[in-house]
Amino acid sequence: MANVALLQGKKVLVTGAARGLGRDFAQAFAEAGAEVVMADILSDLVQQEAQALQKQGLNVQAVTVDLANADSIENAVAKSVDVLQGLDGLVNCAALATNVGGKNMIDYDPELWDRVMNINVKGTWLISKACVPHLKQSAAGKIINVASDTALWGAPNLMAYVASKGAIVAMTRSMARELGQSNICVNTLSPGLTLVEATEYVPQERHDLYVNGRAIQRQQLPQDLNGTALYLLSDLSSFVTGQNIPVNGGFVFN
């Protein structure tokens, strides 16, 4: 159970919240006292997961969002803000991550490249843009963009995903410069290879590479990221912005 007081009264929107890291984040934030809206393109699943958390007494709701569709993004943000009656934090966890690797740069599908960039980079920008007016009304707005440590070590045979996450790190810094005057902190969280649905297709040798290369030699679990995410959303990080924090057991050092 997270520290109940850490996010007490905070209103948070989490994308990609139907499963994986986003689902775990939503639960951790709600356990820490936040009111949470879980957003995902998987409409039925995100509703089911929200209902499961509600049965645990947590304050969560669900909305549908398609990061490849600007109208869907605007509608999801408007509905979320209406439900929450404000917005203090946005966690951009949604991404196209499944079955996007396995081919080298020569053989990579240009259409898949465009899809990855459209969702992972443009979609993150558009939903952040839609949330900014509401975050400005918060005493201390926070945005967490979930990237990946693959962009830090240059993972092979995963070019579009790696490039998209590198763009997220760079975009975060630019956003932090622009939004600092509104007291909005923008930071990047870069997980290592984590045991979630989206990584089930990853070959065992890549899992072994991570485990053997980490300072803490074990598999990474979704809950390993919760503490850092809670910190970045809380008032404890009110003077931290533009930073990329790798949480990967020491596979890549900053």
Q: Which residues are covered by each model-predicted region?
A:
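Short C-terminal tail/terminal secondary-structure segment
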Residues: 2-3, 97, 102, 153, ...
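Canonical Rossmann dinucleotide-binding motif of NAD(H)/NADP(H)-dependent dehydrogenases/reductases
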Residues: 4-37, 175
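Active-site helix of classical SDR
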Residues: 128, 164, 172
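Residue(s) in the substrate-gating loop at a strand-loop-helix junction
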Residues: 148
